[in-house]
Regions:
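Surface-exposed loop and turn segments in beta-propeller and other repeat-based domains
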Residues: 1, 30-67, 102-112, 146-160
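Residue-level detector of Asp-centered blade-edge/turn motifs that repeat once per structural unit
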Residues: 5-8, 76-79, 121-124, 170-172
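Beta-rich catalytic cores
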Residues: 7, 18, 70, 90, ...
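Short loop/turn segments immediately following the C-termini of beta-strands
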Residues: 8, 16-18, 27, 79, ...
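Conserved beta-propeller blade signature
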Residues: 10-13, 81-84, 126-129, 137, ...
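Structural signal for beta-propeller blades
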Residues: 19-22, 31, 91-94, 135-137
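Short loop/turn segments that connect beta-strands within beta-propeller blades
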Residues: 26-30, 97-102, 140-144
Length: 173
């Protein structure tokens, strides 16, 4: 679905319906699978925990399994840090991953109700997240919301509004 490449030629690929994380492929020998990177975790509500504690094994087997969400988009900055956005992951929809796959944004980002569609970074380490509804959210590198702009175009084709966002990029200035 989405792919970024670091300075060493290592590819990071978001694969549809893959719950193991981002696929990491080395350029060695025509492409060597290195493993998975930046895995999302499945969140479980208190209600689900209580249900599972009181249900029989047969009833639990019929419950929907709790699988982690697949990232929807990713980006890489000049330092090699990987950024991902994931729909349906309330507290960790935006991640800033180091080389070990550890999220550097502590506490998660939950400043918006929209579905994140794309992510990129700017020259000052700011992070830009575009929602599928046309809003652009700008965060600092710690994941603190700086401001929101844009919106959904209602057919009037006004400047700064979008009907559906699929990617985002910022210029070098």
């Amino acid at each position: 679905q989405k792919i970024v490449v670091n300075d060493a030629g290592v590819m990071y690929i978001v694969c549809q319906s893959n719950t193991n994380g981002i696929v990491e492929i080395s350029p060695e020998e025509g492409g060597t699978f290195l493993g998975y990177f930046g895995t999302n975790y499945a969140s479980v509500s208190l209600q689900t925990i209580i249900y599972r504690a009181i249900l029989t094994d047969e009833q639990r087997a019929k419950m929907v399994s709790n699988m982690p969400s697949t990232p929807d988009n990713l980006s890489i900055d000049t330092k090699g840090l990987i950024y991902t956005v994931t729909r349906g992951d309330e507290n960790m929809s935006l991640k800033r991953l180091n080389i070990a796959g550890t999220n550097l944004i502590k506490g998660g980002v939950s400043d918006y109700d929209e579905s994140p569609a794309a992510v990129t970074t700017g020259n000052h380490d700011n992070i830009y997240v575009a929602s599928s509804q046309g809003y652009i959210y700008e965060y600092n590198k710690q994941g603190e919301l700086l401001y929101v702009f844009g919106g959904t175009d209602d057919g009037t084709q006004r400047v700064g509004l979008s009907t559906q966002v699929t990617s985002i990029q910022v210029d070098s200035k």
